[in-house]
Amino acid sequence: MDQSGDNLSLQIEQVGSNNKILLYDSGSKITGDDVDIHLHQHNTSSSASTNTIKLWHLYGDDNAIRWGQGAGLTNSSDTTFEADTDDSGGQYTMIDIHGNRNSITGYQMNAGSGAHTADIYIWGDDNSAWIRQKNNSSKNLDLLIKNDDNEVSVLQKDHAAHSAAITLDGSYGTNLNLTQQSTTAQSYTLIQNCLTIGGCNISVIQQ
């Protein structure tokens, strides 16, 4: 781990067995500025699959990350994770933030079966993402934002396999609210580059 400088506040909570928080490789860093990281993983069964979070880089500025696996939050301002006692583990998240005023939050829990996967990459500007995936079967998510004033909220829930790959890729303000829920599988792919004055506003619900 190559952590350096400024007002980093790091709190890691891991309850039970088979929880891992890693840096992606030997070149990974957590570099500086007012980064605040709070990670929580809950996996009480020794036979459950391993929960894994890979932080990868995280360079600087006023970033804040709060991510949970096997436990949930009531809203994006909540700082106390509530455990899913039926969770079977196997959640995987990679987080890669490079700079500016980003904030992620979010969690994954599966209520008994079906490991979830979230790959999140946010590289710059005033982005915010409040992402959560819960309930059974594989939800999947691949989110890449890159830059500008995006605000994203994604919920994937209920007992079916959902999938979402969202790119956005910056240019002025962008709002996205995606909800995928149902007992039947949903799928969504969005690639957006918004140049509209005043920003973009998209809301998708599949149920």
Predicted regions and their residues:
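Low-complexity repeat regions of mature extracellularly deployed or surface/particle-associated proteins
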Residues: 1-207
